[in-house]
């Protein structure tokens, strides 16, 4: 009670309320920033999975092409590879849709590096926004 009276007498009660309000906003901003970091980690894991799948499919394709001394590659082997590439394409498109939801990611950005760079740009813009909000 005495503390409140002294604060009121000094005329800083409004400042203290504003500081407490800003502290609450700061905590909320940092919580949102942490959520964004987790989302970025998830996207990075998905990108790494896609990259490994691309490498695996490339290796399998090379093995099929190099088998049988290049005399004959069965239609089934090629269809299997095409199906794997289609599945991978679906994964990449799904990831791009997830990333671009609420953001303006160009549809032409369909390579792993483009998506990863765009994610880093989004994270940086969120960092800048958080810093602006704190200040």
UniProtKB/Swiss-Prot annotation:
Keywords: Plasmid
InterPro entries linked: NSP3_SUD-M_sf_bCoV
Annotated protein name in UniProt: Uncharacterized protein MJECS04
Species for this entry: Methanocaldococcus jannaschii (strain ATCC 43067 / DSM 2661 / JAL-1 / JCM 10045 / NBRC 100440) (Methanococcus jannaschii)
């Amino acid at each position: 009670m005495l503390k409140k009276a002294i604060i009121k007498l000094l005329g800083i009660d409004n400042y203290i309320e504003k500081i407490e309000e800003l502290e609450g906003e700061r905590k909320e901003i940092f919580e949102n920033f942490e959520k964004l970091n987790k989302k970025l980690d998830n996207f990075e894991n998905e990108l790494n999975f896609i990259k490994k799948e691309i490498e695996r499919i490339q290796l399998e394709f090379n093995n099929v092409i190099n088998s049988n001394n290049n005399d004959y590659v069965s239609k089934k082997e090629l269809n299997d590879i095409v199906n794997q590439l289609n599945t991978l394409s679906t994964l990449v498109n799904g990831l791009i849709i997830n990333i671009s939801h609420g953001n303006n990611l160009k549809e032409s950005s369909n390579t792993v590096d483009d998506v990863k760079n765009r994610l880093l740009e989004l994270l940086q813009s969120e960092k800048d926004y958080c810093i602006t909000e704190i200040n």
